[in-house]
């Protein structure tokens, strides 16, 4: 259960909060503000009431953790800055709407009863483009959307709990190469982190479907060590895939997808697990008779696409709604969407594009103004997260 209110003063009451979402959308849903999608309501709002910091408060029960397990609290994004506290303990700052936060809360949760999670969200401030980036720079108003009260401040991405053992898998991803249509090379990368104060030995197991490609790789980690594991066909012969089901853009073939299930085991017990969905594809670029040409899997692509300004101007598009909206682009015979100024950050958007054969021209959070962000360090850190 979430609630949001101004950090100071009584300009607005406390209301149930929509998480993920922006502050202003919560006040619209609570009936404090008229729906800005009708009439001239967007221009009648007293914007000054939202030009301030807000505090989110969430309550949750302590889940069963188990012996030797670690309880994690994960934040996927807060706009623009956030300070996270659990039961009075500060967990850390978040800076930029793409920066994720992973917090070990095993010893901070209440043994019984409810836990109090507080997030102080700092208002974005002026001027927005490009000084306040990384943020939704169109929130200050554009030719296609009005000013968004509060500049889309809020807990704008998912917040959730997870469990792991002493060793966890961090940010696994897959890279593929397609030398020809009958052969592909799959490269798997993941960080493994030993959170204990003792060295450990374990096994990284994986299975890729379809195809039933199974593998195992022994790993030894020193106490507190974090290391990147890279597996190619040299370590796992099955990662040289014969007759692969290739991912093709809309109109060129099926957008085939694979899943890779990774499990790290210590002493025969699962410590952590992750699942990655990916397409076997390889992009290429070339100049042909003075023309820049995009290729995929060795074939030239005639790009047909449109500009995706935002999912919804108050960030109210979630989950399966992305599938409907991306499917409309497929039905229009598009094969590319430009994620304009990086204004859509949800994983559901990228997953829907994968399923429907839509390539993404993915911008960062800068427009054509020559000015740079005030905090280049935060911009660069968020670029790595993206």
Specify the residue positions occupied by each region the protein language model found.
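Secreted/periplasmic carbohydrate-active enzymes, especially glycoside hydrolases
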Residues: 1-340, 344, 352-356, 385
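Active-site loop/turn elements of alpha/beta-hydrolase fold enzymes
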Residues: 364-366
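Hydrophobic residues in well-ordered beta-strands that form the structural core
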Residues: 360-362
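An active-site-proximal structural segment forming one wall of the substrate-binding cleft
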Residues: 379-386
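Acidic-and-aromatic substrate-binding clefts and catalytic sites of carbohydrate-active enzymes
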Residues: 337-347, 369-372, 376-378
């Amino acid at each position: 259960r979430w609630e949001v209110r101004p950090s100071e003063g009584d300009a607005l009451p406390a209301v149930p909060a929509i998480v993920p979402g922006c502050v202003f959308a919560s006040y619209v849903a609570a009936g404090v503000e008229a729906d800005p999608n009708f009439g001239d309501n967007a221009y009648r709002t007293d914007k000054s009431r939202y030009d301030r910091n807000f505090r989110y408060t969430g309550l949750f029960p302590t889940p069963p953790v188990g012996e030797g397990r670690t309880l994690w609290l994960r934040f996927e994004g807060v706009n623009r800055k956030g300070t996270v506290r659990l039961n009075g303990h500060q967990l850390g700052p978040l800076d930029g709407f793409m920066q994720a936060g992973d917090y070990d809360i095993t010893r901070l949760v209440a043994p019984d009863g409810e836990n109090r999670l507080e997030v102080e969200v700092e208002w974005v401030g002026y001027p927005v483009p490009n000084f306040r980036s990384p943020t939704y720079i169109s929130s200050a108003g554009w030719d296609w959307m009005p000013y968004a009260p509060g500049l889309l401040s809020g807990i704008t991405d998912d917040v959730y709990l997870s469990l792991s053992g002493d060793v966890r898998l961090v940010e696994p991803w897959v890279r593929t190469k397609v030398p020809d249509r009958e052969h592909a090379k799959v490269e798997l990368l993941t960080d493994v982190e030993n959170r204990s104060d003792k060295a450990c030995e374990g096994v990284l197991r994986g299975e890729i479907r379809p195809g039933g490609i199974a593998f195992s790789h022994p790993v030894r980690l020193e106490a507190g060590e974090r290391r990147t594991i890279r597996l190619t066909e040299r370590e796992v012969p099955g990662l040289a895939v014969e007759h692969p089901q290739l991912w093709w853009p809309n109109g060129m073939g099926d957008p085939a997808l694979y899943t890779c299930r990774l499990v790290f085991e210590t002493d025969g017990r699962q410590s952590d697990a992750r699942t990655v969905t990916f397409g076997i594809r390889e992009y290429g670029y070339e100049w042909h008779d003075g023309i820049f040409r995009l290729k995929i899997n060795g074939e030239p692509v005639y790009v047909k696409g449109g500009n995706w300004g935002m999912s919804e101007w108050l960030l109210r598009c979630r989950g399966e709604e992305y599938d409907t909206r991306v499917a409309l682009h497929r039905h229009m015979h598009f094969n590319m969407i430009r994620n304009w100024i990086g204004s859509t950050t949800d994983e559901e958007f990228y997953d829907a594009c994968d399923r429907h054969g839509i390539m993404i021209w993915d911008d960062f959070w800068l427009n054509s103004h020559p000015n740079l962000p005030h905090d280049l360090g935060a911009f660069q850190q968020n670029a790595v997260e993206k």
